Curated annotation (Swiss-Prot):
Organism: Staphylococcus aureus
Ranges of Polar residues composition bias in the record: 1-28
The EC number(s) this enzyme carries: 3.1.-.-
pH effects: Optimum pH is 7.2-7.5. Poorly active at pH higher than 10 or lower than 5.
Top-level taxon: Bacteria
Single annotated GO MF: hydrolase activity
Protein name: 30 kDa neutral phosphatase
Free-text function comment from the UniProt entry: Highly cationic enzyme that can bind human or rat immunoglobulins as well as serum albumin, and could therefore be involved in post-infectious sequelae.
Region (Disordered): 1-35
Keywords from the named record: Hydrolase
Length: 35
């Protein structure tokens, strides 16, 4: 599998609550980059 396919498979297996946490972490990282 390509790395993109593996990432999609891994993301599909992550519960919605963890997806939300990952989204929050990404937002925090983006904000930290701007500060």
């Amino acid at each position: 599998k390509s790395s993109a396919e593996v990432q999609q498979t891994q993301q599909a297996s992550i519960p919605a609550s963890q997806k939300a946490n990952l989204g929050n972490q990404n937002n925090i990282m983006x904000v930290a980059x701007y500060q």
